[in-house]
Amino acid sequence: MKNSYQQLTTNLEYLKLKQMAQHLGDVVDFSINNELSFVETLVKLTNYEIDVREQNMIHSMVKMGAFPHRKEVDEFDFEFQPSINKQQILDFISLRFLEQQENIVFLGPSGVGKTHLATSIGIAAAKKRTSTYFIKCHDLLQNLKRAKIENRLESRLKHYTKYKLLIIDEIGYLPIDPEDAKLFFQLIDMRYEKRSTILTTNINFKSWDEVFQDPKLANAILDRVLHHATVVSIVGQSYRIKDHFSKEND
């Protein structure tokens, strides 16, 4: 016949409370030595389970975000890019912009850190259990085009609209045909004033009509993107070129 301690361990394992079962002995000893109350003991024991589950949830949310890398804001070299307001980026990391369904646009040449910063904000959001998804513009349009051919466009648009934060990377790096531009507009329109979107682009807004090959459609997209948006213009050298020369010097 099991004693009470053994039965409690069995019960915790049966309920799949693995961390509580694993730390039960240590918590009981700590409770006795420090004269904790029954409630205080339970709080300490359940905290082990909650901490692990929270970490697992964070890991899952970050993984679901499909980020290209795990680069966070503390890895960004603000000294190399002095045109960037560090405090502004840290404010983005606080996720205050999500509460107002505001957008962020990172504008600048290739290699200046647009994707790094967008990813950093996305990871911060995912860690706060905010539904977040990262996708390159070309891949997004290919997915929407395929969905349209397969008569499931509405479902796919709803899929990308459901994320509280959607990050669309590299707008303008590849040409966008008129039909794809219409698909892009549909998504932006569905998210407008309902969800936050982060965009990265190397194309000045005046040239978006060339990217989307339709001035009216480009203006409609810009109108919805920029209405509640903060634009971060980055002027500086490429990190990749800097790293290349650093390796040559080594």
Curated annotation (Swiss-Prot):
Keywords of this entry: ATP-binding, Nucleotide-binding, Transposable element
Binding site for ATP: 108-115
Family the entry assigns: Belongs to the IS21/IS1162 putative ATP-binding protein family.
Gene3D superfamilies: P-loop containing nucleotide triphosphate hydrolases
UniProt-recorded name of the protein: Insertion sequence IS232 putative ATP-binding protein
Entry GO MF terms: ATP binding; ATP hydrolysis activity
Any Gene Ontology biological process: DNA replication
